[in-house]
């Protein structure tokens, strides 16, 4: 293998499950000392490829080569022993064990048949120092932040001398400071000659970090951009979705009616100060603020998931009393929660059940018999209207992509007489094509006169969608801007948000 030869290469990789071809003829290469991004819509095949690389799946076709030699892994330990580590969104660590024990889990040093804790602490400390971390290796993992857990996963990979480290949506649960630290570590790993495979929907991260980008679509290889000077946002999006989305937000002003939702000095658990705001019929109002600003807590209170503790909420000028989500739904107030998997869907139930779970009460025969035909027709109507990608309405919702799960939740509320919809991080973890479709649904709801209140930590999204932006800081409203007047600088100034200097972190 010459100095210019790829360290890692995929040759005709295919993967089939019963009735589904997840990957077909994937071929591309990665070089040592390279951050190589993998991009594509949900379901494009990125995670499947990582699971093949890590030994979770066996390929149905093709070969993986490392340093020019074919390799085949039967399990994740085989892959780790060959220097391949995957850092998933759901971190695979043991909370009750110490940091040191987690780093060397499966290869604890022994002396006279017993664990050598002195050597274990020493070796773990070296790995943590390598990453620039000041963490006591004797600390139980459960006391660390998610960002620190992730660093322990990286230290675990380095303890096995991993030369190939893949990250799957690594920043989805991190603070700005933790993201900055992660980028510093990733660029340091690159400088040591390691290959970094990086999967993310966040394009600003991809452009800040990557040396090359490979795009997947529908389980197939599309292209590799290996000259970052020749790729921009538009060309990358077009490669991912197979079409030019143009202005992804597609904002157009629309007439607004009377005040539909009004908050007067409202407080809820987790909201530190009183909140006053209003949303008109057909208006889209965006809530922006730091993590901890109280946006999600406010929405939970309005939906009855928690209790409004003071102040007054009005719906169409009349007091809105909500003691439970059922109360909210019956009065036309719906919520798409931030954590859709935990709070928005019933994972082991079908798409049909998840769409109909709220409206079922309206279709019961004789007050207690489920009307299967009505539910099938209603589910089919929502699946068609929202372009929900599913083999059938009987598919378990847990098997759908994040974007399609979100559309199922929206379809559930379309079955109700909606007056207000509360959207908490509506596109988090969703690919750009699905985002475009969800934005279209939001505009359609507003065009029907529904009041839309959405919270998002994606500032371009807030700027692109909202007729009006309300900025929250530490549980209080710090300012308000109209769409025409809003800029990134103005919003961040009101939020007192320190912009992470991504470029300096990766320099």
Curated annotation (Swiss-Prot):
Organism: Pectobacterium atrosepticum (strain SCRI 1043 / ATCC BAA-672) (Erwinia carotovora subsp. atroseptica)
UniProt keyword list: ATP-binding, Cell inner membrane, Cell membrane, Membrane, Nucleotide-binding, Repeat, Sugar transport, Translocase, Transport
Cellular component terms (Gene Ontology): plasma membrane
Entry binding sites for ATP: 40-47
Reaction equations catalysed: L-arabinose(out) + ATP + H2O = L-arabinose(in) + ADP + phosphate + H(+)
InterPro entries named among the record's database cross-references: AAA+_ATPase, ABC_carbohydrate_import_ATPase, ABC_transporter-like_ATP-bd, ABC_transporter-like_CS, P-loop_NTPase
Cysteines paired by S-S bonds: none
Subcellular location: Cell inner membrane
One Gene Ontology term of the molecular function aspect: ATP hydrolysis activity
Family: Belongs to the ABC transporter superfamily. Arabinose importer (TC 3.A.1.2.2) family.
ABC transporter domain residues: 8-243, 255-499
Pfam families xref list: ABC_tran
Protein name: Arabinose import ATP-binding protein AraG
Mode of membrane association: Peripheral membrane protein
Role this protein plays: Part of the ABC transporter complex AraFGH involved in arabinose import. Responsible for energy coupling to the transport system.
Subunit structure: The complex is composed of two ATP-binding proteins (AraG), two transmembrane proteins (AraH) and a solute-binding protein (AraF).
Keyword Heme appears in the UniProt entry: no
């Amino acid at each position: 293998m010459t100095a210019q030869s790829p360290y890692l290469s995929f040759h005709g990789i295919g993967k089939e499950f019963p009735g589904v071809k997840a990957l077909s003829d994937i071929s591309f290469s990665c070089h040592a000392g390279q951050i190589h991004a993998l991009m594509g819509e949900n379901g494009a095949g990125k995670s499947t490829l990582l699971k093949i690389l890590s030994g979770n799946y066996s390929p149905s076709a093709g070969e993986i080569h490392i340093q020019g030699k074919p390799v085949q892994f039967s399990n994740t330990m085989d892959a780790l022993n060959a220097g391949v580590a995957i850092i998933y969104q759901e971190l695979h660590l043991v909370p009750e064990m110490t940091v040191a024990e987690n780093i060397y889990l499966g290869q604890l040093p022994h002396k006279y048949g017993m664990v050598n804790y002195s050597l274990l602490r020493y070796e773990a400390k070296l790995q943590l120092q390598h990453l620039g971390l000041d963490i006591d290796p004797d600390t139980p993992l459960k006391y660390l932040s998610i960002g620190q857990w992730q660093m322990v996963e990286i230290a675990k990979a380095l303890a096995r001398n991993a030369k190939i480290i893949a990250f799957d949506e690594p920043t989805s649960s991190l603070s700005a400071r933790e993201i900055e630290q992660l980028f510093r570590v990733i660029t340091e790993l690159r400088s040591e000659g390691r290959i970094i495979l990086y999967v993310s929907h966040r394009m600003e991260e991809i452009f800040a970090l990557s040396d090359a980008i490979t795009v997947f679509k529908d389980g197939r290889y599309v292209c590799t951009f290996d000259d970052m000077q020749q790729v921009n946002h538009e060309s990358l999006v077009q490669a991912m979705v197979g079409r030019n989305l143009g202005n992804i937000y597609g904002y157009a002003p629309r007439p607004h009616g009377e005040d539909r939702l009004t908050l007067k000095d409202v407080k809820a658990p987790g909201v530190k100060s009183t909140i006053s705001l209003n949303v008109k019929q057909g208006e889209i109002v965006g809530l922006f603020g730091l993590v901890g600003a109280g946006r999600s807590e406010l929405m939970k209170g309005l939906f009855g998931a928690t209790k409004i503790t003071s102040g007054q909420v009005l719906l169409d000028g009349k007091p809105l009393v909500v003691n439970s989500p059922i109360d909210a739904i019956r009065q036309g107030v719906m919520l798409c929660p931030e954590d859709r998997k935990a709070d928005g869907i019933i994972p082991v139930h079908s798409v049909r059940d998840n769409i109909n779970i709220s409206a079922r009460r309206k279709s019961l025969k004789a007050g207690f018999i489920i009307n299967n035909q009505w539910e099938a027709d209603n589910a089919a109507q929502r699946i068609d209207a929202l372009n929900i990608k599913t083999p059938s309405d009987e598919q378990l919702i847990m098997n759908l992509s994040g974007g399609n799960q979100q559309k199922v939740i929206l379809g559930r509320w379309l079955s109700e007489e909606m007056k207000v919809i509360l959207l908490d991080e509506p596109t988090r973890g969703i690919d750009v094509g699905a985002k475009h479709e969800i934005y279209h649904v939001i505009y359609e709801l507003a065009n029907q006169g529904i009041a839309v209140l959405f919270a998002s930590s994606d500032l371009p999204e807030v700027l692109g969608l909202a007729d009006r932006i309300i900025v929250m800081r530490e549980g209080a409203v710090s300012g308000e801007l109209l769409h025409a007047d809003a800029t990134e600088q103005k919003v961040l100034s009101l939020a007192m948000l320190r912009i992470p200097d991504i470029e300096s972190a990766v320099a």
